[in-house]
């Protein structure tokens, strides 16, 4: 299976460590990842610059992988990234990462589905169409392995089964 170029969407402040674990699994194209320094640089700019950066990154990708932590669903830029992916007819998939440990060895509570508050063009909730992978395991190591074993298929399914336009 070819490695896809994907856009990873996540809450930077709380989940950057968990997101890095997923991004560095080696299951997607290396061109998919951008450095944390890229985001550090762009997040200090004005909203129009951030949107332009997201739009440019999104245009190069076939799928958005939303890494769902405890408060991801409340984040303005995550919502914008999901809406942009839907607008551009990209594959969209969610992966819960709350049971991956952060740099201090902590897990968090499961967050809300970030697709629930976004409506499709036909007025239905995007969450009706988007798969959100939630590992059955609780151990961070097992969750990591479960995500690694499934992420390629999740991405392929998201690309093949896009939400209705």
Where do the PLM segments sit?
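Low-complexity, flexible helical/coil segments
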Residues: 40-48, 68-72, 99-105, 129-133
């Amino acid at each position: 299976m070819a490695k896809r170029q994907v856009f990873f969407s996540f809450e930077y402040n709380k989940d950057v460590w968990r997101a890095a674990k997923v991004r560095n699994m080696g299951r997607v194209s290396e061109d998919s990842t951008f450095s944390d320094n890229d985001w550090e640089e762009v997040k200090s700019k004005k909203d129009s610059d951030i949107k332009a950066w997201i739009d440019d990154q999104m245009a190069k990708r076939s799928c958005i992988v939303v890494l769902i932590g405890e408060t991801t669903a409340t984040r303005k830029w995550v919502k914008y990234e999901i809406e942009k992916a839907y607008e551009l007819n990209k594959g969209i998939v969610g992966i819960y990462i709350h049971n991956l440990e952060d740099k201090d060895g902590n897990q968090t509570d499961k967050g809300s589905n970030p697709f629930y508050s976004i409506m499709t063009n036909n007025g239905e909730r995007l969450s009706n169409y988007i798969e959100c992978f939630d590992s059955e395991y609780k151990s961070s190591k097992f969750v990591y392995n479960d995500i690694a074993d499934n992420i390629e298929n999740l991405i392929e399914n998201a690309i093949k089964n896009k939400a209705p336009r």
